């Protein structure tokens, strides 16, 4: 019997599934909550411009969510929302996208006052290794007065793994709404507080429905395997040109696929056994078959 596959809530495709439907009250609620908890923007109306899930070329292009927002003040702004991989390898790319989006707003000879600010919300499944902040904002700021009101770029980096430290410091019962939201996204379907907030309840309901769709489920899992390969490659250094199947990578991949299973049996295996397990995990082999082959 196949072991149950768990897809993390920050999975690119699943995350878009949570918020893509403009006609769905739950999707609108989650998206509004994400925007208002992470940024100072207060939304009156929301519209997802690229609402198609686009599973036919999903693995070829990241699912960046383009959102048109009408604020409480009546202003219209565009926000890009995305769940993605490593901060160090991608944060300059997102700055480039922001500058490019600004440049495309006007043509030569147009008035510059027509330029509208660009907002990005980017969720990373990692820690903030430099400042250890849950949210880090990037904008063009006045050095003396630390004022970014005139900035055309506002990028919000969310480091989901920082929630672990916050929970240890404050306790789960003292999380604010932003922290609660990040905790649910980070912990996913196995979150022990998933039914304690409306966002968690909606995500749980949508997750169960998502997992019933074989095409969506398989596409999301294929992405997880590909994403792990990229992360492992990055960690080991691009110059090596291949994924090193180290002990830490095997354990990390195993925990990604089987979050509730014991990992102690993986600790004292040989390098050859680690390589065999890694390959079998990539090929979606049954857990019992893996243990039998390894002799556990």
Please report, for each region that a protein language model flagged, where it lies by residue:
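Conserved single-residue anchors adjacent to enzymatic active/cofactor-binding motifs
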Residues: 1-218
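Short, charged alpha-helical interaction segments and adjacent helix-coil junctions
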Residues: 2-6, 77-82, 182-296
């Amino acid at each position: 019997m196949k072991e149950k596959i768990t897809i993390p809530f920050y999975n690119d495709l699943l995350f878009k599934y949570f918020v893509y439907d403009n006609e769905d009250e739950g999707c609108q609620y989650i998206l509004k909550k994400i925007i208002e908890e992470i940024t100072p923007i207060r939304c009156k109306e929301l519209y997802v411009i690229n609402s198609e899930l686009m599973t036919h070329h999903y693995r070829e292009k990241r699912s960046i969510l383009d959102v048109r927002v009408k604020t409480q003040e009546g202003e219209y702004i565009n926000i890009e929302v995305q769940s993605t991989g490593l901060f160090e390898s991608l944060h300059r790319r997102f700055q480039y996208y922001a500058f490019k989006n600004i440049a495309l707003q006007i043509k030569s000879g147009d008035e510059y006052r027509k330029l509208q600010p660009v907002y990005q919300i980017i969720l990373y499944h990692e820690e903030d290794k430099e400042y250890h902040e849950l949210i880090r904002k990037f904008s063009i700021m006045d050095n003396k007065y630390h004022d970014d009101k005139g900035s055309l770029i506002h990028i919000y980096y969310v480091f989901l793994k920082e929630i672990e430290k916050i929970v240890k410091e404050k306790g789960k019962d003292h999380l604010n709404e932003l922290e609660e939201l990040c905790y649910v996204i980070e912990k996913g379907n196995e979150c022990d507080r998933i039914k304690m907030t409306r966002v968690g309840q909606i995500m749980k309901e949508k997750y169960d429905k998502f997992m019933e769709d074989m095409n969506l489920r398989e596409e999301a899992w294929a992405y997880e395997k590909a994403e792990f390969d990229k992360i492992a490659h990055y960690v080991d250094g691009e110059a090596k040109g291949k994924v090193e199947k180290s002990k830490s990578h095997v354990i990390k991949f195993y925990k990604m696929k089987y979050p509730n299973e014991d990992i102690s049996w993986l600790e004292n295996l040989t390098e050859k056994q680690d390589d065999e397990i890694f390959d079998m995990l990539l090929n979606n082999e049954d857990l019992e078959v893996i243990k039998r082959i390894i002799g556990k």
